[in-house]
Amino acid sequence: MFKYRFLSVSLALLLLTGCGSSAATAADSTASVSDTAQNEDSDTAGTGTSALSTGTVQTNLSQIDMSKWQYDSDNDVYYQVGISYCETPADTSYETMGIYVPGKYMTAKDNGDGTWTCSVNTTEKVGNYTASTAPVIVPVNTPGYAAQAAPTGYDSSTSEFTAAGMVVVVAGCRGRDAGAPSGVTDLKAAIRYTRYNEGVIPGNMDSIFSEGMSGGGAQSALLGSTGDSALYDAYLKQIGAVTGVSDAVAGSMCWCPITNLDVADEAYEWNMGQ
């Protein structure tokens, strides 16, 4: 359904900008988009649900070490970075993640070395949420399908979410230089690893949401429309993602998602030609 929606929106934009100035042009465009949708449908038909999303959880990765949290006092946030979310990463400079948790969701003890040992506090609230009900946000900042750098410290871009009581997972991911679908594969692996830590860290693992704009919006849309798709199984196996857990998100926020690249190119060419 998402594919048809994106294709329809893109076609409508073309017609509004004047690409359909003649009936023949509009008919040709409609036929082309329809054919594309049918081809994509047949390509994915029968692929079904990922076999890696059900059954017993299997991984050699450890769960998050609750004795290694760092603390940002200005924003009252506990965080960890450099967390490996796959066993056999293709690019270790990207394939780690950070997690950022509102301070009230933790009961913490200072280790005296810049780290804190934390346990989950289920009674405190931040906004409308507790540690058990807090949504988990996965930002996708990949303009032009670029790579997303793995966080190395406190990430101030997460502050609006954490101030509202949400948990934020910032996952480094490969970009277009690595080829598709590397970026989405990495993000799926990070979501799987996050779910693997259910009950260990704060956050409602049934309420994971991705968000992004432009190329990031496109990859957020893919996360939303390909949850637990078997099409990604081979790629997830290749990097050693956690199995036996879901990579589906509850929703995806997609601002200006650039998805239907062929039609977008046609629109640019038509406008530049004027």
Give the residues covered by each predicted segment.
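Bacterial signal peptide processing site
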Residues: 20-22
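Short beta-strand element of the alpha/beta-hydrolase
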Residues: 97, 113-119, 128-143
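Alpha/beta-hydrolase active-site loop
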Residues: 179-200
